[in-house]
Amino acid sequence: MTNIRKTHPLIKIVNHSFIDLPTPSNISAWWNFGSLLGFCLIIQIVTGLFLAMHYTSDTMTAFSSVTHICRDVNYGWLIRYMHANGASMFFICLFLHVGRGLYYGSYTYLETWNIGVILLFAVMATAFMGYVLPRGQMSFWGATVITNLLSAIPYIGTTLVEWIWGGFSVDKATLTRFFAFHFVLPFVIAALAMIHLLFLHETGSNNPSGLVSDSDKIPFHPYFSIKDLLGALILLLAFMNLVLFTPDLLGDPDNYIPANPLNTPPHIKPEWYFLFAYTILRSIPNKLGGVLALVFSILILMLFPILHMSKQHSMMFRPLSQCFFWILVADLFTLTWIGGQPVEYPFITIGQVASILYFTIILIILPSISLLENKLLKW
């Protein structure tokens, strides 16, 4: 009798995706982040569902409903902090996952890469809308400033902002629609993640060497399922450490103050995972220019397949490219740090230099270095 996992129409799909999937034998721990992102998404959907049972999206009660969750709901404080810090873990895994793709040349799998960039945009939109919901002081002003950026769009900008707000400021209508979108989008993300996997399994996984690995593949289960489980346990350990010991480490203290439209915080900033893009936005004195630079700082990922000039797939055997890749990583850390600093000298100048360096490395230096490496290898 043939095994049910190979014949049943539904179980067969799971079998081809997670059990009998031919996987390159040499993929490292950097390939764990895909499954960790799935794990993070499940945590966010489950905790978010329980939070939605108690949250009210009304300007008068939003802040108190979050307080009520933390004080009166059984383990409400745990659910709330798991959800808030789960977003941070999600973005840490996302940045590492994208970084792995850039380092090992995974962007040459065009469909998978482009769906991945769309996923990144969807996760960023979801996280932003979720940040607005507790209606703390920084939530409110962050929402006001970021949505107001759309007013930089010529001709329709102001109308567009008022349409998104549902009025003349971030109010009840804004909160209600953001809550609706914040609830729905994670399920859209889950669907996109399945499409991402579907495209990945059309070509098979990349591997650290960047070489074709058809002759050296092993089944996903038990080898990589155990490896992914270990990764999930390590992530869970780090995550629960953060949630139970320092739950407010990555948050903003201003969010413990209810939103006050009459009192602007001295320094408005988004969550830490948006700071690099926020710095790029602030570095350009022109509003429309800043918004375009902000969007392009993420959209630039779509250009990597076009900018790939090397005859080699991966950076594993390209020390010059590696050097500039790590300079780019250091630059992103610098941008993140500057985003959290006040808008004054020397932070403005450092931010502008780091922003120029970010685009220069990606658009000019990395392709040029790749061509130089080809020449040095006489390719």
Curated annotation (Swiss-Prot):
Keyword Heme in annotation: yes
Organism: Hylopetes lepidus (Gray-cheeked pygmy flying squirrel)
One Pfam family hit: Cytochrome_B
Cofactor(s) needed for function: heme b
Protein name: Cytochrome b
Binding site for heme b b562: 83, 182
Topology in the lipid bilayer: Multi-pass membrane protein
MF annotations from Gene Ontology: metal ion binding; ubiquinol-cytochrome-c reductase activity
GO CC terms of this entry: mitochondrial inner membrane; respiratory chain complex III
Family to which the UniProt record says this protein belongs: Belongs to the cytochrome b family.
Quaternary context: The cytochrome bc1 complex contains 11 subunits: 3 respiratory subunits (MT-CYB, CYC1 and UQCRFS1), 2 core proteins (UQCRC1 and UQCRC2) and 6 low-molecular weight proteins (UQCRH/QCR6, UQCRB/QCR7, UQCRQ/QCR8, UQCR10/QCR9, UQCR11/QCR10 and a cleavage product of UQCRFS1). This cytochrome bc1 complex then forms a dimer.
Cellular localisation: Mitochondrion inner membrane
Bilayer-crossing regions: 33-53, 77-98, 113-133, 178-198, 226-246, 288-308, 320-340, 347-367
Binding positions (heme b b566): 97, 196
